[in-house]
């Protein structure tokens, strides 16, 4: 299965959720780190948290390829920011979706 194109230049949709240590701190760092995400071709369509559990984040993004997010998160500079943001990476669930 080719997840890299879906027939042309169409972006891949990523839907995910994860826990953070503190929503306000994580969101501030997420917003401040938008430049590197945009530089990697990653577009954020939605980011929010649960009303009942404010430290549970839900996110919808578009990426150039199915593995773009993983590559971005593994970059040492980005990994450092992600760790400092309080993102509990072991709780992350991401799904590659169609339109």
What are the language-model segments listed below?
Residues 2-99:
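Short S/T/G/P-rich N-terminal loop/turn motif that feeds into the first structured element of a domain
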